[in-house]
Structures are given as C-alpha cells and as structure tokens.
Amino acid sequence: MLTLIGMYLSYNDRGNLKKVLQNWPKANVELTVVTDGSRILGLGDLGINGMGIPVGKLALYTGCAGIRPEVSLPLTLDLGTNNGKLLNDPLYMGTRMKRVSEEEEGKYLDELMVALNEIWPGQVFSFRPCKLC
C-alpha cells in the first residue's frame, strides 16, 4: 500500500498547476495546508525542506480537531530559496534558483487557488509560513 505524505508543486509547473494537482490520488480534499518554506519557525528559509510544517499542522488538526487525514492535502510550493547553503548543497532536492519575487509568487498563488477550487470546491485553506501569507 502506498503511503502519501504530501505534494510538491514547482514554480516550473506554473500554467499547469491544475493538471499537476489532479495527480493527487485522493478524490476528495477538504483541507489544504500550504507552505512555501520561506519562514520556518525561526529556522528561516528552508525551501522544500519545510514540508514538515504542513504535515505537522495536519497531524495536529487530526489529533485535536478530528480532521480526517484522508481528506487533507499537505502542499509545499517550490518557489526557490534564498538560502545559499541549500542552493550549494548537492543533496538539496528543491529547484536551484533564488526565490521568486513577491509579484511572481502572487501570480503563482492566484493560479494555485483557482486550480484548487476547481478540483476540490469548498475546501478550507491554511497558509503556514509563506512569504506573502
């Protein structure tokens, strides 16, 4: 049995976010927790290494609020990183580019919100540390 932890979307996926999101194998999503990894709990810009934040938040929502994990989507946006250590780390799995501008991120988030609402209308969104959130 395949156990899913979360989904990553790259800045390079822009223009195709809906198509990529449709690969999520769960038919129903009621709650999406999103991070861009830019401001992780005093640790700073962790890029895609920030996936633990949406996963952890959803675990908290499951344990404390009874949110069913099968209707949740932990989502990390790979919009680059300004962390030079990560950019130079050969083991870093994120896109090796400087973090996109606020204007570019805003356009990306607009496309993302439209796509998420078209695929799973009526869901709740929680943006955890994000540059624009």
Q: Where on the chain are the PLM-derived regions?
A:
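Metallocofactor- and cofactor-centric catalytic cores in central/energy metabolism, strongly enriched
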Residues: M1-C133
